[in-house]
């Protein structure tokens, strides 16, 4: 059975999202949700979850280059993951997101130059990278 997985790139101002199928190991960008100090419009996220009906949610875990937690943002990403699980009753996994934003910017720039580098595009592409990295980790 192939599962549908939805990923989130948590940020205090914007939360990117992506969707993917476990069978193909590929992901596509969805939507960037505006956040107010890390708090999204939960109704918008609920609408997306109802539309796509994922079996699992993956949240990018921000760390430094050595994999250590970042003092301010890492605990907030974990809290966001807990809230997703509590609100929607879906399993949630955290996944290392080191360098995902840098990689997302590079990919978007190569596809469309500076015009492609909007905050929403970068956050959604970061969610794609997080999810595809999660797929790779599952197949080890």
From Swiss-Prot:
SMART domains xrefs: YqgFc
GO terms under cellular component: cytosol
Family to which this protein belongs: Belongs to the YqgF nuclease family.
Pfam family membership, one: RuvX
Protein name: Putative pre-16S rRNA nuclease
Cellular localization per UniProt: Cytoplasm
Enzyme class at the top of the EC tree: hydrolase
Entry keywords, A to Z: Cytoplasm, Hydrolase, Nuclease, Ribosome biogenesis
């Amino acid at each position: 059975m192939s599962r549908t997985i939805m990923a989130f790139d948590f940020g205090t101002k914007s939360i990117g999202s992506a969707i993917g199928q476990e069978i193909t190991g590929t992901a596509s960008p969805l939507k960037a949700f505006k956040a107010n100090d890390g708090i999204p419009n939960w109704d918008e996220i609920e609408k997306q979850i109802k539309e796509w009906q994922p079996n699992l949610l993956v949240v990018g875990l921000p760390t430094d280059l050595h994999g250590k937690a970042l003092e301010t943002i890492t605990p907030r990403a974990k809290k966001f993951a807990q809230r997703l699980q509590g609100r929607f009753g879906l399993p949630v996994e955290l996944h290392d997101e080191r360098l995902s934003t840098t990689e997302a910017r590079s990919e978007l720039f190569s596809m469309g130059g500076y015009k492609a580098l909007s905050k929403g595009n970068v956050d959604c592409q970061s969610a794609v990278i997080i999810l595809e990295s999660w797929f790779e980790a599952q197949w080890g």
